[in-house]
Structure formats: C-alpha cells, structure tokens
Amino acid sequence: MALDPIEKKPLRRFFPGSMILSVGSYGCNLRCPFCQNHEISWSAEAFAYADHAESVTPEELASAAIRLKNRKNIGLAFTYNEPLIGWEFVRDTSRMIHAAGLKTVLVTNGTAELAVLEALAPYIDAMNIDLKGFTGHYYTHVLGGSLDMVKAFIARAAQICHVELTTLIVPGENDSIEEMRAMSAWISGLKDTGGDAIGREIPLHISRFFPRFHMTDRPATEVKAIYHLAEIARENLRYVYTGNC
C-alpha cells in the first residue's frame, strides 16, 4: 500500500498532478515470463508470502483513502498484482470509495469476462489496461492468455470510463513496426456506445523491457526502438507516451 502520483499507474490524462492510494495483493491470471512484479504475482515467493500476508477489509481501505484526502488523495487504485482475480473485493471496496465521493482506478491485464467488467462498471472511474501485444500466438504461447478476450475487454471499458493502455515492448516478441501499426490502428477504431469514434483519444504508453524473472535471454529494449515505435503509433493515436527510457 502506498500513496503514489497518479502518473505512476500510469495515467497521464486523468486528474494529472494528483495522488492516489494504491493497493495490491498476490496472484495473477497470466504467466508472463518477464513479469515486473513476479514477487507478488505468480512466483514461488508470491505464493509463500501470500500465506502470511496482512488482511485488509474493504471498510479499512475506504477509511484509509478518506483519511488521505488532505494529502491530495483522489481515491483508490487497485494495482501491483492483477486485481480482477479478486473482483468481488474490488467491487465491494469501490462501492464504498464512490459513496465517499472519491475515485476508483483499476490497473489490469484485461483478462476477464465481460460480465465481470459490467459488474464493476458503476464503480470504476479509470483504468490502465495492458495490451501486451497484438498477435494471438504471443498471448497464447508466451503469456498464457487470450488476445481476443483482452480486445473485447478494452473495447467495452473504453465505453464505460477513462481508459489508457500500456504495451511493454519485448525484443523479438512484439517489437515489429507492422504489429505496432496494426495495434494502434485497432485502438483508433474503437467506438462509444453511440457508434462515434473515440479510439484516437485513448492514450497509449509504450514501455521498455528489462530482462528479469524467467526471461533473461535477451537485452533490454533499445531506447531508440521505443521512440521509433511511438512515432509509428502516433500515425493513429493522439496521445502516445514512452516509459522506462
């Protein structure tokens, strides 16, 4: 649990300059071999720590967020690990946060059924969703997930609340110009419930990979590659940011 700048989620176009109480737990529903948070996601250490983790109730989290309002806190962000593996807890806590007039943020990999998203929709104000790549092979065989599920989640989330996306560029996996062009074109084509295009305004964060966890067989992504892919994405998107550079 930490009081973080909102930009750290990362959210660049949602209450910039504010702070948000950020909380996480243990576990994830993907198996990314390069996981940046493997200590709390799906490593052996994560499962060992989880057995002795502190338990916090929705009421306690809501009270903590309210107490921090005098430190520019605008609400509560579920982050660090994958929050949707415990979506009922997120729902119950977010309901209390909203009742207190505060904001709720979800940082997620988007690997969830749309029924879960609809259950959370009344209580979520912003999301940063990982769009980790744009090929089914990468999602299925490297990450252990489903690109189609994530695309459906993003498309609906963009109709519900403020959405920003993050893509970690891994050398030799999702770093081609063609893939970034296809991804950004798909994002730009997203529509609201009335059929109007909204995708061009969705911010995309393109981040640099560093070797860690089970993927140490390749170097960090070159900074110039990140900047070049950002320029490609800007062909279709208005707000493109680079990270870890």
Task: Specify the residue positions occupied by each region the protein language model found.
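Alpha-helical scaffolding segments of alpha/beta enzyme cores, especially the outer helices
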Residues: 60-63, 88-99, 115, 119-122, ...
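Auxiliary Fe-S-binding modules of radical SAM enzymes
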Residues: 177-245
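Conserved glycine-rich "GG(E/T)P / GGGxP" loop and the immediately following alpha-helix
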Residues: 66-93, 138-151, 167-182, 188
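Conserved Radical SAM active-site core
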Residues: 1-126
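Conserved radical SAM core fold
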Residues: 41-44, 83-85, 110-117, 126-143, ...
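Short glycine-enriched, charge-decorated loop/helix-capping segments at active-site entrances
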Residues: 47-51, 140-145, 218-219
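Structural preference for beta-strand elements that scaffold enzyme active sites
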Residues: 73-77, 103-105, 126-128, 162-164, ...
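Glycine/serine-rich loop-strand microenvironments at binding/catalytic pocket rims
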Residues: 30-31, 150-167, 174
